[in-house]
């Protein structure tokens, strides 16, 4: 349909835009020439994939390409020591897990060199990260994304699976995630996997809804921003009478499991600590103001009411993730009184990666044909 083609083109546009702003921001730290070369190389690779993704050799050896990419990327990380990184997500995971093992309240922990940087993610984020912490293998978190993408996401065709996997592997943003041992693409990919299976909600029975709610209650307990696709899905299904009781049952179970880890924190370290230091407070005070969070939530609710087909929910989630990141950038720019300073120095552009993951999934082979023409 015409609307579907618009979604696909916009998804491709977001994919290109987010990669380009990474190239410009980090390339300028070296020289303008690096920016130009980076843009030319990236766009050349994209056009090359548009022509070659359907090649029989590529299709037959895609798993080998994944393995080679993983080994090569891991070798590159050996030249970038953890201690040299300004990105502190691995430090936050380390501090949180160290605090728990030492019997200290984890949301008061912080890196020694950044005392004001308290943990922002929700508890289950650290549960998922714990095996990598114990192995001291933080590279494994972003490296897992390419395998999750290829083996776990549902696609309508193998061509689509191969195309988007290749576009992921050549993305500067994904290589950046691996080099700095970040977690955003992997975390948002897990939510995307859940979201793409959740479109079957209307056909599920009560027990299936229960187990999905249990799973989602834990997944929502990774990052608060993932409330965006939940609200869109929830409002979409509430507007359909045949699923209203299911969505109420699902919501109740999800909330119970979402709150369970906070209840555990309160039982061990006291209600006062949990109320005073928690992810909601950290994110509202250190990242964006509460009024902006409420505005984004409202937009997500309104979007859910306008969705016509469940298949389009991924696009609306992608769009509102982007609006959330861009509005945060604008707020930071006004606070800094400089758009360029906020972009180049202050604002964390990795917030755009939540949108990036959903946008990449929406890119289809037929769009590549039109671009080639």
Show where each model-derived region lies.
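Transmembrane-helix motifs of polytopic, lipid-linked glycan transferases
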Residues: 138-162
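Intramembrane catalytic core of multi-pass membrane enzymes that act on lipidic substrates
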Residues: 65-139
